[in-house]
């Protein structure tokens, strides 16, 4: 993978990721397509309407259903999903912990039971890479030991040592496979303990294609999260992309960009959309509320998304109240457009050396009202 750092503005960065299936401008927000699709959207929505170049799918879910060998036999995840941009796949470790009963953490991996049928499985560093090779992921994440917060210092230390060990094992295994189109990212752990974060970086070998800051948005405060990012990001190689996993709000994303983060994913835009919360530059609105029943204006004036160019708030209000499936599609298209435009505009501001003023103006308006 080739990563070109094009510009910086203080610590904020703009770059280009050259992947096997697409060139991706950073900062980038990756819509979450856990099961190989973004909920309520298809590949045409993702590629042609949203213009997404990189989306996230999940190893745990694709492994359990339909099975990575099924996907491989059908031509890999891109052909299977008919999405010809790029895929990043998470290792599935988080889902193994969070969705399964009787999870057992071992030195060689994670033993878990399927949330679908109760069958028993073992994820090892090599196993999760083999699954991702079968999917033909453009970016693969290593298996890591994620800790919920707050956590005792001893547990954090165990987590970072195990995560670093698994990451380094994954790197050696990946080198043996000689698959340059499948890029491998390491994950830095350590909770909000800054010394543990430094130790995690120090224990993780160089040579990965990118580095992720994991283990955040799992119970810590916003200030703790930002302090952790501010400490960790400068420790990572400058010539590699930096990925903040599972975070988050528009404010979180702009704060993290200002601290040197390049890549983001979160279910928030689509999950909020399905639950009637829509993003606008003046804050969030709840489309289920009564005032929108007769509102003939778009979700946001001057928004170029598919929904705003065609439909009114009144129509979206009606679809939500009627529990029509079309509502989820239109609302998700709007919210994802908002997120993708946010990082696009942030990138342009970095290129033009005006990121801090862009961020300030955006947040002043965004936080002015939510209704």
From Swiss-Prot:
Effect of residue 233 to T: In strain: P1
Recorded consequence of changing residue 258 to G: In strain: P1
Region described as RNA binding: 246-252, 270-274
GO biological process: queuosine biosynthetic process; tRNA-guanine transglycosylation
A Pfam match: TGT
GO molecular function annotation: metal ion binding; tRNA-guanosine(34) queuine transglycosylase activity
Effect listed in the UniProt record for changing residue 48 to G: In strain: P1
Obligatory cofactor(s): Zn(2+)
Ligand binding (substrate): 90-94, 144, 189, 215
Catalytic activity: 7-aminomethyl-7-carbaguanine + guanosine(34) in tRNA = 7-aminomethyl-7-carbaguanosine(34) in tRNA + guanine
Pathway note: tRNA modification; tRNA-queuosine biosynthesis
Residues involved in Zn(2+) binding: 303, 305, 308, 334
The EC number(s) this enzyme carries: 2.4.2.29
Subunit-level organization: Homodimer. Within each dimer, one monomer is responsible for RNA recognition and catalysis, while the other monomer binds to the replacement base PreQ1.
Name the UniProt record assigns to this protein: Queuine tRNA-ribosyltransferase
